[in-house]
């Protein structure tokens, strides 16, 4: 799983006289932020950010200044959100801050294949991490799929009390998988799912549960790239033959070595007859 977070200014950052006046102004807003000033600070920070974007597009401020303002702006937003969380009555301007500030967790699935009702009907399914349950979540996130479609995301989550715009999650550890479960989906979603971006059926497991525990009855492999391409009239065997012809010609002409040709063909076959999702 890959994640993306909004930039944040380090706590130890100090503004210098050489910094752009917009940076200095936004720093003062950030440094003096409190419950009494947060509404004015919110509007001022937005204005400074918009002004910096305009100046950057005209080449008046450089990339370093643009990055400083961006990090500081989101730091102001985080601090306002922290203060607002303790208020009994939260101003309307701050009600969507949780959604804006949430990390993005990119998950290895297609929303259109596995959860079509979520996209088409705004259906809400129970979703939660299924590991590290003995650890308190330290982040919040929205979930993104691996299609190229901007609608391939989950931004509504059910809790015991209401619907929220972010999901409590853990910081993903380097080189470690992180699994999130979607529940009460059922076979109906599988029947409705389509091959958006040519992502096929996922792997499936049939599990039986009794008083003694559980047993895995059957493992069903998901569709391969070759199978999905065949649906849209691309013959996998012909694709391999065409590549073999090109490799043979390239080796004869000295464009690639024999070892490079073999490796290229092996990688191509591995991808073609492999899973449509990341492995």
Predicted features along the sequence, with ranges:
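Charged (often Lys/Glu-rich) extended helix/loop segments that serve as interaction or gating elements
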Residues: 1-279
């Amino acid at each position: 799983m890959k994640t993306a977070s909004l930039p944040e200014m380090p706590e130890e950052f100090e503004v210098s006289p050489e910094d752009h006046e917009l940076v200095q102004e936004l720093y003062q807003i950030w440094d003096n932020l409190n419950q009494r000033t947060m509404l004015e600070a919110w509007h001022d920070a937005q204005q400074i950010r918009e002004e910096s974007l305009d100046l950057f597009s005209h080449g008046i401020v450089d990339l370093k200044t643009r990055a400083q303002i961006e990090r500081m702006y989101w730091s102001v937003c985080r601090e306002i959100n922290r203060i607002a969380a303790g208020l009994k009555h939260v101003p309307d301007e701050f009600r969507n801050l949780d959604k804006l500030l949430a990390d993005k967790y990119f998950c290895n699935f297609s929303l259109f294949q596995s959860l079509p009702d979520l996209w088409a009907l705004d259906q809400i399914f129970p979703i939660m991490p299924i590991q590290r349950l003995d650890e308190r979540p330290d982040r919040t996130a929205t979930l993104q799929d691996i299609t190229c479609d901007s609608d391939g995301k989950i931004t509504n989550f059910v809790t015991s009390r209401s619907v929220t715009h972010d999901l409590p999650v853990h910081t993903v550890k380097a080189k470690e998988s992180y699994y999130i479960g979607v529940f009460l989906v059922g076979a109906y979603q599988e029947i409705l799912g389509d091959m958006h971006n040519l992502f096929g059926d996922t792997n499936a497991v049939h599990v039986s549960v009794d008083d003694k525990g559980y047993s895995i009855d059957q493992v069903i492999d998901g569709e391969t790239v070759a199978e999905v391409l065949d649906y849209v009239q691309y013959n996998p065997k012909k694709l391999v033959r065409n590549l073999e012809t090109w490799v043979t010609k390239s080796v004869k002409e000295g464009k690639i070595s024999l070892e490079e040709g073999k490796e290229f063909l092996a990688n191509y076959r591995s991808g073609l007859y492999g899973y449509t999702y990341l492995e």
